[in-house]
């Protein structure tokens, strides 16, 4: 007389395990597809009837390193949970950053509260010349050559949001040419024209 079959054994159990492994692998691949930078972690206190209740806030920048970036702010009782919330919030606010040959199309200034950030295009090989908060946003966005300067507040939150405001204000040369009614050659950077000429050769 055959004994009772164990739950999960046999072909059905193996199929479930394989499916779980495939799903777990897909989730891990999606998680590692993004570049994450924790810009600031602060401990905050809320005064309640029984005393003070502490929690943590995390400012996180997430991007794919290829022109997409977002910023999120998370709050929780533990640091890892605050970071996780910040990552999810950042993914909800993804936006595209116009780039040309690893840099930005034109100089621009971004402002947020007392934070003011100036961004300028740079030639290949320059690298990211920027402070910590600005660098985090630019690296996650996939900008490899750029000059920047913070002209206002030193508050990391203001600096990050000022950088985001600057990147959101960037326009592609095609958009500028169409708005001004000019040919692309009159407004496009030389690097873009050389790249297009090389691609067409």
From Swiss-Prot:
Keywords: Ribonucleoprotein, Ribosomal protein, RNA-binding, rRNA-binding. One of its GO terms (biological process) is translation. Residues 14-23 have a biased composition (Basic and acidic residues). Residues 1-27 are annotated as: Disordered. PROSITE patterns: RIBOSOMAL_S5, S5_DSRBD. GO terms for cellular component: small ribosomal subunit. Residues 34-97 form the S5 DRBM domain. The keyword ATP-binding does not apply. GO terms for molecular function: rRNA binding; structural constituent of ribosome. The N-terminal domain interacts with the head of the 30S subunit; the C-terminal domain interacts with the body and contacts protein S4. The interaction surface between S4 and S5 is involved in control of translational fidelity. Belongs to the universal ribosomal protein uS5 family. With S4 and S12 plays an important role in translational accuracy. Located at the back of the 30S subunit body where it stabilizes the conformation of the head with respect to the body. This is Small ribosomal subunit protein uS5. The gene is rpsE.
